[in-house]
């Protein structure tokens, strides 16, 4: 006898049946049928989904050859809709083994769901806090598998540095209305560019936030129209076509109470005038009997009189007062940001237990460009500085780009070497000569250079001159060795390098300005160790950092100055920093 090999038979989809709101206990004879583009849609009662929304999630086509890729894509897209439970798909071959009856069974998730969350939080301002949030999710809002999420949140936390404010605690309240569409929501068809297997989504968000923290306090209102899609399981793209944010400082008169170093510098300039009675209106007596500038009116009037020539000071003092006043105006003025950005992310991680992977993220952002183009059409008002105003607020105009790279190497036994690099720059132009505080960069803190507190490092070789130091250029490098100790307790050794600088803006201090390769000598280095406890859902982290190289010091004092626990910086964090 001779062996025979059966030839491979190509199978094609002959019938494609979609069972919407499938109930395993329901009777087939009660189902109704609607046909849409060669798809048979079975349902009972009333069909709650638009046929197109169902068909767009199915990648099998009548008379097309069966491909396992289509099966995988169908599972992914149906799951991505967040409207159905994990689908059940079966294939029934006919007598020739070349024709398939393809059945997709869809069981709906609950129309409504309520989520309540309690989290332990950490931020640049608060050392540790608690956050509460509640959200109501409504699925299939308009019959096209849309998801509406209405959420509210609140938090209270302990200030990371008691000297930042007279208050001990911070608080925050906010809320969002967020609707997601499982397609690109534009007036033209984008399917040829972004097909449905890329899991396209459109998101419209409106939110508000009330923040009470370091004294200035903020209220913000933001609106976002964004689109995201995933060409592969490892690639993700996001476009925020419109990102509008309005930030209002509630207590601008509290500036000099919050920025104590800035106030001290201004008060030093005012020292020669304190004994002259004709300038008594600038000053008051503090609790210790010292004569100081009165906050806010005395300090503001003194600065204005110096700058308009009413009071005579030397050139160095004039520059100091001018820098202080520019900073005060920038940090207390309200911000209006109309931005568009694009982010591209790749992550090679294959699963939650994959300890050997890389991830990179590129982001490009532009703000104010569209409003600038409309200046010849819309008669904007202008302020005294010549800036154009929208709703009485100067709009921000800048371009910004960032690159973030993370690499993890597994070296066995639960040990990991983790590396991160970050670079970012934001360049103001047109209607702005600086970057809004909410879009600028800072250095230090539990997720950055852990040998400095947040906002304490930089810019450049300056020595924490502004209390909350920020700038528009940032470079950062982090290296960490992670290892198990016992059970859920883990340890780490780390080195953090980086700094922030001013560039292409109105900063005049040469020590704060990036001037080329020579400025790389201002990169700070912090080293230290940490303990972590893995609670499964989150990791509690305690790191201690030492200033190994401090660019704010002079000469040999830059290295290992104060390398002891008395001058160490202790950081509490939630989850890994990268």
Region locations from a protein language model:
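Hydrophobic, lipid-facing positions within transmembrane beta-strands of outer-membrane proteins
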Residues: 100, 130-134, 171-177, 202, ...
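Periplasmic polypeptide-binding modules associated with outer-membrane biogenesis and secretion
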Residues: 1-121, 153-154, 158, 423-424
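Outer-membrane beta-barrel "beta-signal"
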Residues: 533-537, 564-578
């Amino acid at each position: 006898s001779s062996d025979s090999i059966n030839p491979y038979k190509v199978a094609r989809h002959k019938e494609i049946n979609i069972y919407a709101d499938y109930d395993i206990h329901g009777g087939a004879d009660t189902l109704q049928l609607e046909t849409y583009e060669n798809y048979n849609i079975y349902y009972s009662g009333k069909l709650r989904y638009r046929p197109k929304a169902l068909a767009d999630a199915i990648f099998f086509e009548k008379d097309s050859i069966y491909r396992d890729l289509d099966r995988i894509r169908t599972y992914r897209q149906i799951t991505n809709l967040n409207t159905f439970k994990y689908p059940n798909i079966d294939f029934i071959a006919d007598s020739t083994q070349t024709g398939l009856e393809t059945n997709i069974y869809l069981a709906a998730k609950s129309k409504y769901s309520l989520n309540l969350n309690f989290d332990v939080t950490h931020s640049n301002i608060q050392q540790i806090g608690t956050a509460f949030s509640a959200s109501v999710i409504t699925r299939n809002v308009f019959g096209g598998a849309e998801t509406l999420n209405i959420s509210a949140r609140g938090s209270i936390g302990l200030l990371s540095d008691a000297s930042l404010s007279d208050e001990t605690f911070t608080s925050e309240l906010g809320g969002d209305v967020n609707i997601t569409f499982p397609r690109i929501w534009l007036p033209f068809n984008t399917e040829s560019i972004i097909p449905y297997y890329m899991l396209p989504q459109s998101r419209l968000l409106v939110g508000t936030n009330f923040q009470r923290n370091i004294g200035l306090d903020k209220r913000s209102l933001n609106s976002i129209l964004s689109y995201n899609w995933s060409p592969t399981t490892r690639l993700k793209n996001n476009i925020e076509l419109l990102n509008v944010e309005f930030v209002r400082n509630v207590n601008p008169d509290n500036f000099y109470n919050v920025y104590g170093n800035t106030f001290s510098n201004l008060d030093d300039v005012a020292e020669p005038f304190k004994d002259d009675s004709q300038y008594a209106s600038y000053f008051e007596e503090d609790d210790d009997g010292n004569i100081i500038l009165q906050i806010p009116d005395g300090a503001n009037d003194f600065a204005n009189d110096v700058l308009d020539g009413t009071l005579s000071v030397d050139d160095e003092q004039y520059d100091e007062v001018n820098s202080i006043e520019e900073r005060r105006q920038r940090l207390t003025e309200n911000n209006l940001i109309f931005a568009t950005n694009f982010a591209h992310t790749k992550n090679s991680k294959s699963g939650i237990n994959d300890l050997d992977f890389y991830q990179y993220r590129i982001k490009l952002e532009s703000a104010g460009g569209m409003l600038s183009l409309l200046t010849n059409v819309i008669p904007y008002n202008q302020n005294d500085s010549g800036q154009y105003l929208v709703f009485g607020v100067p709009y921000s105009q800048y371009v910004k780009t960032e690159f973030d790279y993370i690499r993890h190497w597994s070296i066995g036994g639960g040990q990991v070497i983790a590396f991160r690099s970050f670079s970012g720059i934001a360049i103001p132009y047109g209607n702005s000569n600086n970057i809004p505080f909410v879009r600028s960069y800072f250095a230090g803190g539990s997720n950055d250079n852990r040998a400095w507190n947040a906002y304490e490092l930089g810019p450049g070789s300056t020595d924490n001159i502004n209390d909350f130091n920020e700038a528009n250029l940032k470079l950062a490098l982090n290296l960490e060795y992670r290892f198990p100790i016992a059970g859920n307790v883990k340890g780490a050794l780390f080195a953090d390098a980086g700094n922030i600088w001013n560039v292409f803006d109105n900063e005049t201090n040469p020590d704060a300005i990036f001037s080329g390769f020579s400025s790389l000598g201002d990169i700070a280095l912090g080293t230290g160790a940490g303990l972590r406890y893995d609670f499964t859902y989150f990791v509690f982290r305690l790191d201690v950092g030492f200033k190994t190289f401090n660019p704010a010091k002079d000469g040999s004092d830059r290295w290992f100055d104060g390398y002891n626990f008395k001058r160490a910086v202790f950081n509490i964090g939630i989850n890994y920093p990268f």
